[in-house]
Amino acid sequence: MSKKRNNLLIAASGTGGHIFPALAVSKKVEKDWDIHWLGVTKRLDSEFVPSKYNLLTLNLETPKKNIFRVFQYLKILFSIFNIIKILKEKKINLVFTTGGYISAPTILAAKWLKIPVILHESNLIPGTVTKYFGFLCEFVLLGFKDTNYYLKNCKTIFTGTPLRDQFYEINPLPKWVPRGKGPLLIVMGGSQGAKMINEIFYESIDFLIKQNFRIVHIIGENNSNNLVKFKSNNYVQKKFTNQIASLMQNCELVISRSGAGTINELIQTGKPSILIPYPNSKNNHQEKNAMILSSIGGAILMNQNQISKLFFEETLKRILKFKLKKGKPKYEILDLMKENIKNLDTLKSTNEIKKLINYFLKEF
C-alpha cells in the first residue's frame, strides 16, 4: 500500500513574474508534496509547468477596461465554486500562490474550506490581490523588506524572491550567442515581450551594430508577428530562451522592463541595466521596482514616453565607453554600477520558503 502524501496546490499563472518564482519553489518541495498546479487556459502555464505536476486550468481572462469588465470580474468570482471542488477532490492541505487574478478566487476558496494559504509578493508595491486578500493568508512572503510598510494588517515574512536554480550556478555562454570582442547587450521585455522596447531598439539597431556591440534580442512570444529582419553576425533575435541566467551572467548590460523577477535576477547576477518600466503597471509598481536599482546607481531608469533615439544612443555610448587595460577593455561606468549592486542583499529564498511550506506537512 502506497504511503499517503500531502497535497500542495500552486496557483500561479499569466506571466513569468508569477510562474517562475512558483516553479523555483515547487522544485524545492516536490519530494515532500504531491503538487497540483492551478493556472489559466491559453497562458504561459502549459509551456512552463512540468508534466509531472498535475496542471489544472480555468477559463478566465484578465479584467480589461471595457464594457465587459463587470462580467469578467463576475466570471472570476464564480470560479470560486470550481476551485472549491478542486480543493476537495485533490484533498489539498496547503495553497501557495504568487498573486495575479488566479490568486483571489483561490484564496477565498481555500479560506472557505479552512485550508492555509501562503502568498508571495515579489513587487515592492504590493499588487491588488496582496493588498486586499493578504490578511486572509497564513503568511505573506515579501520579495523586498520595505513592502512590509504597505501591509500592516498581514503576517509578513521577508524571504526575497525565489529564482530558478540556474541563477545560483555558473553557466557558460550559449553557443548561438554572437562571438567577438564587443560588449554583449541583452535586450528583453519580460516573458511576454515589450513592443515599445522592441521599437525603441529597432530605431537604433544600425547605430549599435556600427559600435561593434554584440546583441541578443528577446522579442517575446506576443511579438512574433513584429519581427524585423536584420542580418548581422553580431545580432541574434529570439522569441524566448530558457537560458536567460547564462545570458545575464555573461553580458555587459541588460536593457529591459522592470518586473520584480527581472530586478531580482539583476541583483543576483550583479549586472548593470537600462530599465524602461511599463508605464501602465498597477500602482506604477514597475517604476518603483526600477528605483531599487537606479537609486543606488546600479541601473539607469528611462521613462518610456520620454525616450528619444538620440538620448538612447548617447546613453549607451556613455556607459559603454571603455579604456584598454592590459589589452582588455575596462568599462569604468559599468564597473561602478556593478559595485553599487553589491550593496544589495541577496537571499537563497527558496530554502526559506521550503521551511515555511514544510511547516504545514501532516503526518499520516
UniProtKB/Swiss-Prot annotation:
It comes from the Bacteria. InterPro entries: GlcNAc_MurG, Glyco_trans_28_C, GlycoTrans_28_N. UDP-N-acetyl-alpha-D-glucosamine binds at residues 15-17, 123, 164, 191, 286. Keywords: Cell cycle, Cell division, Cell inner membrane, Cell membrane, Cell shape, Cell wall biogenesis/degradation, Glycosyltransferase, Membrane, Peptidoglycan synthesis, Transferase. One of its GO terms (molecular function) is UDP-N-acetyl-D-glucosamine:N-acetylmuramoyl-L-alanyl-D-glutamyl-meso-2,6-diaminopimelyl-D-alanyl-D-alanine-diphosphoundecaprenol 4-beta-N-acetylglucosaminlytransferase activity. GO terms for biological process: carbohydrate metabolic process; cell division; cell wall organization; lipid glycosylation; peptidoglycan biosynthetic process; regulation of cell shape. This is UDP-N-acetylglucosamine--N-acetylmuramyl-(pentapeptide) pyrophosphoryl-undecaprenol N-acetylglucosamine transferase.
